[in-house]
């Protein structure tokens, strides 16, 4: 069985049912060309294949893994082609600010700053902007949002042991 590493906030989003997809960079552009020519499918080259059961890598042994999911779809797209709906499926969510007013989008991977017992987080005007910040917080050099790399898009569903 294959594993996938997520940060603490992403694991919580999976447990809450808010995260049902993730993206990984395609480093070899020739793969994209073969898929576009329809001589191959994303499943031919992706690390995770449709139907694979994957466990969330934690400090436990694989046999003790708490979170399992099944890959239900794999596709290829440019990173910046992500839809607002897919941003939400990647763990971005709307939240209420402390005043109770409806605020912009925020993703909890942004570290809050506490000043005089008030928690400040980074808020964004759209799902798209929040996802851009999330991506750049985790991306390797040469694969930042601005580089707009091709990515495998993995959709998944949680499964029970």
Describe every region a protein language model picked out.
Residues 1-161:
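Secondary-structure transition motif
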């Amino acid at each position: 069985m294959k594993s996938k590493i997520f940060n603490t906030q992403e694991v919580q989003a999976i447990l809450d049912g808010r995260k049902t997809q993730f993206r990984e960079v395609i480093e070899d552009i020739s793969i994209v060309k073969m898929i576009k020519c329809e001589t191959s499918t994303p499943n031919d080259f992706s690390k995770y294949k449709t139907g694979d059961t994957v466990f969330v890598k934690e400090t436990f042994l694989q046999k003790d893994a708490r979170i399992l999911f099944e890959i239900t779809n794999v596709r290829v797209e440019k990173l910046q082609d992500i839809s607002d709906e897919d941003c939400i499926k990647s763990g971005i969510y709307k939240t209420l600010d402390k005043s109770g007013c409806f605020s912009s989008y925020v993703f909890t991977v942004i570290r809050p700053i506490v000043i005089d017992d008030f928690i400040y987080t980074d808020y964004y005007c759209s799902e798209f902007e929040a996802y851009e910040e999330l991506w750049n917080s985790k991306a390797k050099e040469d694969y930042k949002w601005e580089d707009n790399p091709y990515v495998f898009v993995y959709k998944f569903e949680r499964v029970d042991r």
